[in-house]
């Protein structure tokens, strides 16, 4: 694994623990264990609870294993997609869990590590895969999909409402794209200079988000898992989801609202405190929603 020195700061830890309410002898399923920050905080807070942590990224899992090695008797980590969590639990002989945590953000390692292709800040191969065993890369998507399909992806997944077609056209004109800076160049050429100046965030943020979501099937996977999540929880068990853009948040909100087996604990999404945002600016866009499995309703 590459040398990596960036410190990962998990988002909204206090709120996660407050809503999950981990207790001794209870099992928490961390669906996006990442570098292990939330899991470590939960295990420190609750000396008798157990964590089952999963992630598709084998590189961040190795970081999590190191971070959680002092809790090896209470933390079990697995490389698997959360959409297959029900299969994993069955394999482990775990019928139900008492808490589910999902932190849908890109990890610090994925952003700051080398050659993952998630960042527009430096030149890297156009990869963007969270699961390095997947065959679909950003480079393949950007160089092979038709212009119309690229425009749809950028419009829907990047919420790039005005300039999606122009960006898609420039991507096609600039083919082949091989690095992250090739994609930045195409977006820069597509946007009017006044639009670049007007944007509060980097002008390529929306396009990078769109391609990343498509490469990793993020929204499809989230929908598929949330449909099953309520049946993985014991009565009184809780699910906590932290999302970082409106597409994810909308899916979580609607799934919770439409469920007959969940009681919503957060009528509106909980946002990070101003103090946390000062200490960790990446927390700014975080939105936390929580729900509790009720006794009745479809069993």
Swiss-Prot record:
Residues annotated for S-adenosyl-L-methionine binding in this entry: 36-38, 55, 103, 110
A biological-process GO annotation: rRNA base methylation
SUPFAM superfamilies noted in UniProt: Putative methyltransferase TM0872, insert domain, S-adenosyl-L-methionine-dependent methyltransferases
Subcellular location: Cytoplasm
EC number: 2.1.1.199
Catalysed reactions, as listed in the record: cytidine(1402) in 16S rRNA + S-adenosyl-L-methionine = N(4)-methylcytidine(1402) in 16S rRNA + S-adenosyl-L-homocysteine + H(+)
InterPro entries according to UniProt: RsmH (IPR002903), SAM-dep_MeTrfase_MraW_recog (IPR023397), SAM-dependent_MTases_sf (IPR029063)
Gene3D superfamilies: Putative methyltransferase TM0872, insert domain, Vaccinia Virus protein VP39
Pfam families assigned to the protein according to its UniProt record, in alphabetical order: Methyltransf_5
Region (Disordered): 268-299
Positions with biased composition (Basic and acidic residues): 268-282, 289-299
Keywords: Cytoplasm, Methyltransferase, rRNA processing, S-adenosyl-L-methionine, Transferase
Top-level taxon of the source organism: Bacteria
A GO term, aspect molecular function: rRNA (cytosine-N4-)-methyltransferase activity
Assigned GO CC terms: cytoplasm
Similarity comment: family membership: Belongs to the methyltransferase superfamily. RsmH family.
PANTHER family: 12S RRNA N4-METHYLCYTIDINE METHYLTRANSFERASE, S-ADENOSYL-METHYLTRANSFERASE MRAW
Known role: Specifically methylates the N4 position of cytidine in position 1402 (C1402) of 16S rRNA.
HAMAP family (UniProt xref): 16SrRNA_methyltr_H
Protein name (Swiss-Prot/TrEMBL): Ribosomal RNA small subunit methyltransferase H
Classification of source organism: Bacteria, Thermotogati, Thermotogota, Thermotogae, Thermotogales
Gene (UniProt): rsmH
């Amino acid at each position: 694994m590459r040398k990596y020195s960036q410190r990962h700061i998990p988002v909204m830890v206090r709120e996660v623990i407050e809503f999950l309410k981990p207790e001794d002898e209870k099992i928490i399923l961390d669906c996006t264990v990442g570098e292990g920050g939330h899991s470590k905080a939960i295990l420190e807070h609750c000396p008798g609870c157990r964590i089952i942590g999963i992630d598709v990224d084998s590189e961040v899992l190795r970081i999590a294993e190191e971070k959680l090695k002092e809790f090896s008797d209470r933390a079990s980590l697995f490389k698997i997609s959360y959409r297959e969590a029900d299969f994993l639990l069955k394999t482990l002989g775990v019928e139900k869990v008492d808490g589910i945590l999902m932190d849908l953000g890109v990890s610090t390692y994925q952003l700051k590590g080398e050659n993952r292709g998630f960042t527009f800040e430096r030149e890297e191969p156009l990869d963007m895969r969270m699961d390095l065993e997947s065959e679909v890369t950003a480079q393949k998507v950007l160089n092979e999909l038709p212009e119309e399909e690229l425009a749809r992806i950028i419009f829907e997944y990047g919420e790039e409402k005005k300039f999606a077609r122009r960006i898609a056209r420039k991507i096609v004109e600039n083919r082949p794209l091989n690095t992250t800076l090739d994609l930045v160049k195409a977006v820069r050429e597509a946007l009017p200079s006044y639009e670049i100046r007007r944007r509060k965030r980097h002008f390529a943020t929306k396009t990078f988000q769109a391609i990343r979501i498509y490469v990793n099937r993020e929204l499809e996977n989230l929908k598929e898992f949330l449909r099953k999540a309520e049946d993985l929880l014991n009565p009184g068990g809780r699910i906590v989801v932290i999302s970082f853009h409106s597409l994810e948040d909308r899916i979580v909100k609607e799934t919770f609202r439409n469920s007959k087996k969940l009681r919503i604990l957060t009528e509106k999404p909980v946002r990070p405190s101003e103090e946390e945002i000062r200490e960790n600016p990446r927390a700014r866009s975080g939105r936390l929603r929580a729900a509790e499995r009720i006794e009745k309703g479809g069993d």
